[in-house]
Amino acid sequence: MHELSYATSVLNAILDAVKQQEELGRKVIKVNDINLEIGDLTLLSVDQLQFVFEVISEDTVCKGAELKAEIVKPKIFCMDCEFEGNLDTKDELEVACPKCESRNVKLKGGKEFNIVNATIEFDDEE
C-alpha cells in the first residue's frame, strides 16, 4: 500500500505550511480540504489515500480534511509518426501509438503527485 507514503508526504507538507503560517503570527484552526493532482500512472487509489490520511492526521489540524483529487491522464508522443495525444491506460505495459501502433513512444505526464492548494481556517477570519 504505497498510499501510506503519499499520505504521509501530504500531511508533512501541509503541517509545514501550517507551521510557517503560525510563525507569521496566524493561528490555524483547521485544514478543511486539500486539492491534489494525481497522475493516472501512479496507480493510487484516492479512496485508500483518503482513508490512510484520515488515520494519520487524527491528532493534527488536518483531522477531518477532505482530499480532493484531479486525475491527470498521461499523454503519448510517437517518435515515428509524431502523433501526440492521450494514452489509454487500460494496460500500461502495452504502450503503443494509437495512430500507427509503433512502440517507439515517449510518455508525457501521468506520474504527477502534486498538492495544488489547501483550504485552511484561521482564528483571525470571521
From Swiss-Prot:
Residues the entry annotates as binding Ni(2+): 2
Binding site for Zn(2+): 78, 81, 97, 100
Coiled-coil features, chain-numbered ranges: none
Leader sequence segment: none
Membrane-spanning residues: none
Classification via Pfam families: HypA (PF01155)
Gene3D superfamilies attached to this UniProt entry: 3.30.2320.80
Domain of life (superkingdom): Archaea
InterPro entries noted in UniProt: HypA/HybF
GO molecular function: nickel cation binding; zinc ion binding
Keywords tagged on the record: Metal-binding, Nickel, Zinc
UniProt record, GO biological process: protein maturation; protein modification process
Function field: Involved in the maturation of [NiFe] hydrogenases. Required for nickel insertion into the metal center of the hydrogenase.
Family under the similarity heading: Belongs to the HypA/HybF family.
Stored HAMAP family: HypA_HybF (MF_00213)
Protein name: Hydrogenase maturation factor HypA
Gene it is expressed from: hypA
